[in-house]
């Protein structure tokens, strides 16, 4: 908050310290709390991308509480053996990762061309995790 910074006569050299969340001192040596001269920023957005990967629970801590999780879903659960051999995931497995990670939204993509109807991926994933969207060509998403 520039008005408050001017009011406290904080040196320009200290702006970087304020941006880092640190307290500073004014020209008279008085300590100025960071919260007294700054405004709260907006919450950062988060997005994680897990593609060309087999079902791998150890990745969960790395995508914990993410807003938007893109996860490949190359196969359906009926073809889980093929998924295991080719080191890809099923829609259900992607949903399990999203659920365990407490993601807000799951975006599925990287579908095998063997499936003509892609809505089955969304339906399979929704048996585990409700907020599922298909990453279809040309679709954009806002985080």
What are these regions (language model features)?
Residues 55-143:
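Binuclear metal-ion centers of metallo-dependent hydrolases, dominated by the metallo-beta-lactamase
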């Amino acid at each position: 908050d520039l008005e408050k910074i001017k009011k406290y006569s904080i040196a320009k050299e200290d702006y970087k310290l304020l941006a880092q969340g640190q307290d500073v001192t004014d020209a008279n040596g008085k300590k100025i709390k960071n919260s007294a001269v700054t405004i709260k920023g907006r919450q950062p957005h988060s997005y994680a991308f897990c593609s060309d990967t087999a079902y791998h629970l150890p990745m969960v801590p790395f995508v914990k509480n993410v807003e938007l999780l893109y996860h490949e879903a190359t196969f359906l659960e009926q073809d889980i053996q093929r998924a295991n051999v080719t080191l890809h995931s099923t829609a259900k497995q992607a949903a399990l990762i999203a659920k365990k990670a407490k993601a807000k939204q799951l975006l599925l993509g990287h579908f095998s061309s063997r499936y003509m109807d892609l809505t089955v991926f969304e339906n399979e994933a929704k048996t585990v995790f409700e907020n599922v969207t298909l990453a279809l060509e040309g679709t954009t998403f806002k985080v």
